[in-house]
A protein has these predicted regions:
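ADP-ribose/NAD+-binding catalytic cleft of ART/PARP-like enzymes
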Residues: 1-52
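Conserved catalytic/binding loops enriched for acidic/polar residues
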Residues: 60
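Conserved NAD+-utilizing ADP-ribose enzyme module
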Residues: 10, 19-24, 51-53, 63-172
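Compact, well-ordered interaction domains used in eukaryotic information-processing assemblies
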Residues: 44-48, 57, 66
């Protein structure tokens, strides 16, 4: 399955040195919304030993299949609020059974509900958690437990110039 993921520049060195990157930190977001993170992590059929939380990426953006272009990068950064100078774009090919797909907006709704931000339901248990897996349309996020060197098809840096992103392929 083709996936795009934005990862901190340090991840590239970890992949070069170790051959694999695992999400085994207790991130701020996982601490704030552990039920949502555990739900998507547990939905991954085949997990890398040692991984403790999902890595996030994209399967579909702007309601179309992925291509590495300025429009796709702009939309992904709008949704994730990443610091563009600190991240690289990884184009991955991962076996389907190692990936779980979710509707980005339904996942965000679930996180907001769990965190108590503008709650619609009286408690998180009332939130229809299965809606995060409704992926017929929209922005589709992908979660997986590791990035292995062999998953990487391309790595790109990007820089915003005049409201467009200049994309540079990095030799890996």
């Amino acid at each position: 399955m083709k996936i795009l993921t934005f990862q901190h520049k340090d991840i590239l060195n970890e992949l070069k040195n170790k051959g694999v990157y695992l999400a085994n930190i207790n991130s701020f977001y996982k601490q704030q919304t552990p039920k949502c993170y555990n739900t998507v992590f547990n939905s991954i059929k085949v997990k890398e030993p040692g991984a403790t939380q999902p890595i996030f990426g994209w399967k579909k953006v702007l309601n179309k299949e992925l291509i590495v272009d300025s429009e796709t990068i702009k939309r992904c950064l709008e949704m994730t609020y990443l610091e563009e100078d600190e991240y690289l774009l990884f184009e991955l090919n991962i076996d389907d059974d190692k990936v779980s797909l979710q509707n980005f907006y339904n996942f965000v709704d679930a996180r907001c509900e769990e965190e108590g931000i503008d709650p619609y339901y009286e408690n998180f248990e009332e939130f229809p958690i299965d809606t995060i897996f409704e992926i017929e349309d929209g922005e589709i996020q992908a979660t997986f437990s590791s990035i292995r060197k062999e998953y990487i098809e391309n790595v790109y840096s990007y820089k915003k110039i005049n409201n467009e992103y200049e994309i540079t392929k990095i030799n890996f």
